[in-house]
Structure formats: C-alpha cells, structure tokens
Amino acid sequence: LRDVELAPAASLGVMAEGEAVLKGLQSFHSLPCFNTYLRQSYYIDVFNKGATPLKWKTSVTNDWILVSKKSGETTTEERIEVSIDWAKVPAGERILGTLDIMSDRGEKETVYISVFNPTSPSLAEMDTLFVENNGYVAMDAASFHRKVENDDIKMIVIPNLGFENTAVQLGNPMAKAQRTAGR
C-alpha cells in the first residue's frame, strides 16, 4: 500500500457510465445509446484530481439532452444524470449530440451521446416485447414460453423477487447432485 499525493491545483476528471477504463487508455467518452423503447437515463461522474475544490459547468449541443446538474463545485466527485427529452429529440436510428464539461481552469471533456428513436414500430407496439439495447436482450425469466422438467428438477417461479419482480429457481437447492451426463 502507498499513499497518493494529489496535485495542489484542481483538475477535471470525467468517467461516463459503461466506460471500462479511465481516459488515456480510451480516446473518448461516450454514454451507452439511449433507446426510445426503454426511456432510461445514464450517469457521468465528474471528479477532482487535485487537492483544491473544482468548479465545473456543462453545456449541451441540443436542447433534447437533459442533465440533472448544470454546474457544481466538488473536492471529490459529483454524479450527473443524463436523460433525453423524447418530445424534442428528432426521429432516427442514430441521432448524435455532445455534452461538454468545462472546469474554471479551462479544461474541457466531451461526452458523446447517441439516441435510437425510430419512427416505427411505435412505443405502444413494443410494450410487451423484449427489446435489444446496447447489444443485449434482457428477458424476464418467468416469461418463459415452455419448460422441460423431470421428476427431480422442477422450475419454481418465485414472486416478489428480482428486477422484474419475479424470479425462477431451477430444482431444489437441498437435493442431491444430479448426474445428467448421457442425456
């Protein structure tokens, strides 16, 4: 273990949700794609790499990009929630914008924002379907179409548990181990 000495002057640092590494190993900041069918928000962490307080402010390229904080002062870090005004964003499958974060010392970091807002299918048509988002599809386990069980292994739906408010348990966790080789 070793102590890290902070620089005496404030210095701007930015990390966007979904980034695997700090900038330096990656050449730009970008949030995951906003999807009209999911209407989610993402975050950006603004942090201070120095010992004195950091003053910062934000600027967006489009009025449909909404931020929870437009400016601030921090000695450690602050989180900005970013969302989309879906009534103002233009229709299209790859709408782009940027969010700039500037320090009072002249430092600037840009975060790229992309939006998936197709005209068709409508939000109402997609209401009960599973939607791909940023390269994956998340399905509620209890919404299975069919199940295959045997005498020893049953699927048990557990209400009021999990992200979608239902979960599925496979088998009895207290039962002896099953040998399924050769099936």
Describe the residue ranges of each PLM region.
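Extracellular/luminal low-complexity segments enriched in Ser/Thr/Pro
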Residues: 79-95
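C-terminal edge beta-strand
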Residues: 108-120
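Short, polar loop/linker segments at the starts of domains and inter-domain junctions
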Residues: 150-167
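A short beta-strand micro-motif common to beta-rich folds, especially ectodomain repeats
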Residues: 44, 90-105, 113
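Surface-exposed binding patches on compact interaction domains or structured appendages
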Residues: 49-81
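Extracellular carbohydrate-recognition regions
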Residues: 119-153
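Short beta-strands within extracellular/lumenal beta-sheet-rich domains
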Residues: 38-40, 166-183
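Beta-sheet-dominated interaction scaffolds and their linkers
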Residues: 2-49, 89, 123-126
